[in-house]
UniProtKB/Swiss-Prot annotation:
Major localisation: plastid
Listed EC numbers: 1.16.3.1
Top enzyme category: oxidoreductase
Role this protein plays: Stores iron in a soluble, non-toxic, readily available form. Important for iron homeostasis. Has ferroxidase activity. Iron is taken up in the ferrous form and deposited as ferric hydroxides after oxidation.
UniProt keyword terms in alphabetical order: Chloroplast, Iron, Iron storage, Metal-binding, Oxidoreductase, Plastid, Transit peptide
Residues at which Fe cation 1 binds: E102, E137, H140
Record InterPro entries: Ferritin (IPR001519), Ferritin-like (IPR012347), Ferritin-like_diiron (IPR009040), Ferritin-like_SF (IPR009078), Ferritin_DPS_dom (IPR008331)
CDD domains assigned: Euk_Ferritin
Gene Ontology process terms (BP): intracellular iron ion homeostasis; iron ion transport
Protein's name according to its UniProt entry: Ferritin-2, chloroplastic
One term of GO molecular function: ferroxidase activity
Domain of life: Eukaryota
Organism, scientific name: Glycine max
Region Extension peptide (EP), residue ranges: 52-84
Amino acid sequence: MALSCSKVLSFYLSPVVGGGDVPKKLTFSSFLGLSKGVGGSRSSRVCAASNAPAPLAGVIFEPFQELKKDYLAVPIAHNVXLARQNYADDSESAINEQINVEYNVSYVYHALFAYFDRDNIALKGLAKFFKESSEEEREHAEQLIKYQNIRGGRVVLHPITSPPSEFEHSEKGDALYAMELALSLEKLTNEKLLHVHSVAERNNDPQXADFIESEFLYEQVKSIKKIAEYVAQLRLVGKGHGVWHFDQKLLHDEDHV
C-alpha cells in the first residue's frame, strides 16, 4: 500500500517479510526510518519511495544544509558556553563593568543609609530612601548578572571601592550634600549605561542594545529627575527645621524611589 506525504517527498508503507529488500532511503532517513515488529516475523517501516519527485524549485531555506556552517556547530569542550551567539568579547566586558558600577553605587547608598540611621542623626526618611536605593542598585547588578548568563558570557566580579562613612558638610548640611551626591551618582550611572548601549550597537548586537534600553535607560532618567527635585527642595528649606519636614515626607512617601 502507498502512503503519500507531500509533493516534495513521498513515502509508502511496505510490508517486510523476513529479510526482504527494503526500498532505497532518503539521505535523512535516520529521522524517518521507523520500524515496529509485529509478532516477531513481520514489520512495517516508513521508507522513501524510489520514484520521489525532485525538491520544488524556489526553496529558500534548507535547515540541514544551513546547519553545516561552522559557526553553528555546538561546542564540545565542557568549559565553553553553549548558548553564546553574536556576543562580542567587549560586550561581555562592558556588562561586567556595569555590574561593578551598580554594586559600587549600591555600596555608597548603603553607607548613606547607615549614616542617616545613626542615633545622633536620626533622619529616618533619608535612611529609608538610601536603603531602598541601595537595594535597587543591587537588583540592577543581579539583573545584569542574569543577562550575562543568558547570553553565554562569564560573570567577573571586580573589586568594590570602600565608600566614606561621614557625610557632614558645614556649608550645605548632610541632607543636601548626600542628595547632591546621589544625583551625581545617578548621572554617572546613566553615562555608563549609555556606554554599554554604544558597545552593543557597535557590535551589531540588537538584543543587548534592547536589553539596556528597555530595562535601564528610561528608569535611569526617571531617577535623575526625582533626585533633582529632592535637591531643589532641600536647597529651598535650608539646613534647619525644613530638613526634618523633608525627612518626614520621605519617611511616609511610598513612591519616592
